[in-house]
């Protein structure tokens, strides 16, 4: 049985009766103090904070873990990162956030250099305008074009090439 809780924009609240992951890398009974939609502190049943007047939510024994990081995926819910649209990135980021992923670095395929530059530009523009309700776009996982044809997997061999510092610079410039 899986339970999901959605923390809406709130000034301060306590989520009690959850299983928290502690600094000593153990799961234990406790709770979470949330302030301005961010985790302010985590407590165990031995050190329950006294915060009268704050909103209290009963987690009903659910596990509460840090947000997950998705570093290698190409898309979801019918959207692909290589669709090269801010709408696709937004849909992907919102979906990822809805399943506990707070940080994303979606992957490209090995495409022509010009297409990759466009995708990187779109991602950079999205990052500047990013909707705070979706997972945070922190980078792009580029699967080429500088890969070995021997280990190409599903990548299009026509777009594979030796590393080229000028093209690397073009990718960096497009990402700004």
Where are these regions (language model features)?
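Short amphipathic alpha-helices and their capping/turn segments at secondary-structure boundaries
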Residues: 49-61, 119-134
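Divalent metal-dependent hydrolysis catalytic cores, especially in the metallo-beta-lactamase
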Residues: 74, 90-119, 135-148, 175-176
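Short, charged beta->alpha transition segments
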Residues: 5, 89-94, 166-171
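Short, small-residue-biased leader/transition segments that mark boundaries at the very start
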Residues: 1-7
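Metal-coordinating catalytic core of metallo-dependent amide/deamination hydrolases
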Residues: 121-176
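Histidine-rich, glycine-flanked metal-binding segment
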Residues: 11-13, 20-65
């Amino acid at each position: 049985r899986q339970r999901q809780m959605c923390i809406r924009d709130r000034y301060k609240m306590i989520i009690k009766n959850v299983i928290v992951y502690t600094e000593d890398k153990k799961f234990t009974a406790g709770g979470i103090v949330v302030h301005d939609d961010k985790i302010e502190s985590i407590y165990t049943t031995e050190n329950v904070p006294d915060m009268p007047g704050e909103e209290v939510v009963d987690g009903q024994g659910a596990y509460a873990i840090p947000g997950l990081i998705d570093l290698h995926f190409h898309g979801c819910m019918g959207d692909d990162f290589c669709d090269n649209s801010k709408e696709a990135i937004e849909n992907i980021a919102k979906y990822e956030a809805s399943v506990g992923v707070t940080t994303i670095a979606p992957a490209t395929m090995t495409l022509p250099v010009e297409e990759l530059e466009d995708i990187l530009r779109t991602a950079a523009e999205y990052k500047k305008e990013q909707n705070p309700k979706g997972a945070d776009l922190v980078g792009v996982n580029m699967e080429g074009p500088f890969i070995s044809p021997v280990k190409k997997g599903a990548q299009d061999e026509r777009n594979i090439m030796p590393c080229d510092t000028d093209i690397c610079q073009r990718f960096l410039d497009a990402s700004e």
